[in-house]
Amino acid sequence: MTRRIVLIEDDPDIARLVDDMLTDAGHEVDVRSTLADGTIDRDTQLVITDLVALRGYDLQAARAWIARVRAAFPEAAVIVSTAHQPAGVAGASGLGADAVLTKPFDVDVFTRTVESLLGA
């Protein structure tokens, strides 16, 4: 079953890699460099986001970013993919996300996390 995924990633190389992995797995991927790019599709099942809106990686700013993502895609699960996890975050729940993957991430872990959140 094709699932709609929005990928918010400002690094074009990482965006291309993740897009290829998800597309190869049969998903429809909308790649954006910011939350504002593109239209809001309420049928989106999953959002994978870097903490692209942040200049630093403090906990309050990260939580605010995830809240903006959730407001834009209220029905979607959210994965944070980041090279710099904010200090004080013990896991996804600390950010308000469903999962946090630290870059560079293991492809198998990434795939299992995506499929788990999509209910596949």
Q: Which ranges hold each PLM region?
A:
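Conserved acidic carboxylate
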Residues: E9, T82
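Two-component/phosphorelay signaling modules centered on CheY-like receiver
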Residues: D11-V31, A36
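Acidic, metal-coordinating helix/loop segments flanking the phosphotransfer/catalytic sites
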Residues: E28-L46, L54
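Conserved phosphotransfer cores of two-component systems
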Residues: D41-R42, A67-E75
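Conserved phosphotransfer microenvironments
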Residues: I48-V69
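Alpha4 helix (beta4-alpha4-beta5 surface) of REC/receiver domains from two-component response regulators
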Residues: Q60, A64, A83-L101
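C-terminal output helix
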Residues: F105-V114
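The C-terminal output helix
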Residues: E115-A120
